[in-house]
Design a protein with these regions (language model features):
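Short, solvent-exposed loop/turn segments at conserved positions within beta-propeller repeat blades
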Residues: 93, 134-136, 183-189, 229-231, ...
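Short, low-complexity, disordered segments immediately C-terminal to signal peptides
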Residues: 32-59
């Protein structure tokens, strides 16, 4: 039976389950095991700062947890990938006010209103949270996640740049993009730049090709290389010290989705293909395809294994060095596929999107078997986000952030 035959059979099963939109990547109609509501439920949310039924205990390894805590958030839905982060046992959620909570208890550690722009990503570099200033004054600020206090401040220039935005950070640099203002105060072009985290001085600044956009960029730093994708189907690698463009190529698909950089390879989903490129040369090292009429979601490398799902709800585990398949579990038609992953205590966790019956899935990493699903009972189809720290998974969904002790 060929790949197309398998796809048609699976499409019929998906359609029968009411999941036709999943074939387009929407994933809106899958269903699965549902956890009892952690408190409240419905489409409404408690008032900011209000907690819902705290006090879950860690289950046996692989067991379904009860929420340790749950609080309302002000998340606006605009941070595409990095909406929640955990650093040094502090939980940070994008929103206004920006709020930090204790990972174990959910207790509010600090809250700051009007500190950054809407849709700010929670990007950490060497223990500092870097953000664009909410004043739209060209400043980039660094915050201590534990206290919320400003520890760093810099800018690209005085008046020639519009709305610089942080795309990545490491111990040495903060990487930003910004529009270049013309005489009519328009921004037909943009720059990418690196700012020294010690001195606050601009280390390098490179104008990007005309027609590229300052929005829609997803970036990762790996050693001496800054890697990023954009809406114009570009995959680009630059030298972190000089800004020199090492290589760039068209991926064949507009992308601001997540990708991985692992042991000298850039691994990215380009629709039906999952592809790996050499970080230094751009040469393609391996690729493989999912089923016809399907596409891959965002990949993640955890404990040396590449995990990825596709839009017909199959889950894959792959050797990231070779692209060789460890396993492929196509039997999860009745649950929505995860787009974001974490691994805690030997269990693989995945966050779904656009499915009111989705949530945080727990999988056996040896074969992809579904162990359980946590759903907050809200009925919202908003995307789920997850982050992990210690023996905890943090879930963000429908303006609620929930702490799940999982080990």
């Amino acid at each position: 039976m060929g790949r197309g035959d398998v796809s048609r059979r699976r499409m019929i099963k998906l359609a029968g389950a009411g999941a036709g939109l999943a074939l387009l990547g929407a994933g809106t109609a899958a269903c699965g095991p549902v956890e009892e509501p952690a408190g409240g439920g419905g489409s409404g949310s408690p008032k900011p700062g209000e907690s819902a039924r705290p006090g879950g205990d860690a289950p046996a390894p692989g067991g379904k947890p009860k929420p340790a805590w749950q609080h309302a958030t002000t998340y606006d839905g605009l941070a595409w990938i990095s909406a929640v982060a955990v650093v040094d046992d502090v939980v940070l959620v994008s929103g206004d006010p920006l709020v930090a909570r204790d990972l174990a208890t959910g207790k509010e550690l600090w809250s700051r209103a009007e500190v950054t722009t809407p849709g700010a990503s929670m990007l950490i570099g060497d223990g500092t949270l870097y953000l664009a200033s909410a004043r739209y004054d060209g400043n980039i600020i660094g915050l201590d996640p534990k206290t919320g206090r400003d520890t760093w401040r810099s800018r690209l220039g005085d008046k020639e740049y519009s709305q610089p935005r942080v795309i990545a950070a490491d111990a040495d640099h903060v990487y930003v993009v910004a529009g270049i203002l013309d005489k009519d105060f328009r921004t037909p072009d943009n720059v990418i730049a690196a700012i020294d985290t010690s001195s606050g001085k601009v280390v390098w600044r490179e104008q990007r090709d005309h027609g590229t956009e300052a929005n829609g960029i997803t970036a990762r730093v790996s050693g001496k290389r800054l890697v990023y994708t954009d809406f114009r189907e570009n995959l680009t690698v630059r030298d972190t010290a000089t800004g020199h463009q090492v290589w760039t190529k068209k991926t064949g698909r507009s992308s601001n989705r997540g990708f991985e950089v692992h042991e000298g390879l850039v691994i990215i989903a380009t629709g039906e293909q999952l592809r790996a490129f050499d970080l230094e040369t751009g040469a393609e090292r391996w690729s493989f395809a999912t089923e016809k009429y399907s596409r891959f979601n965002d990949p993640a490398v955890l404990d040396g294994v590449l995990y990825v799902s596709d839009t017909v709800h199959a889950l894959w585990a792959v050797d990231p060095a070779t692209g060789k398949r460890h396993w492929h579990n196509p039997e999860s038609l009745d649950i929505d596929a995860p787009w974001q992953f974490a691994k805690v205590g030997g269990v693989l966790y995945g966050a779904t999107q656009f499915d009111k019956n989705g949530g945080i899935h727990a999988f056996d990493p040896s074969d992809g078997k579904l162990l359980w699903t946590y759903n907050d009972g809200s009925g919202d189809i908003d995307r789920w986000y997850l982050a992990s720290g210690g023996r905890n998974v943090v879930a963000l969904h429908a303006k609620k952030v929930t702490g799940l002790p999982v080990g």
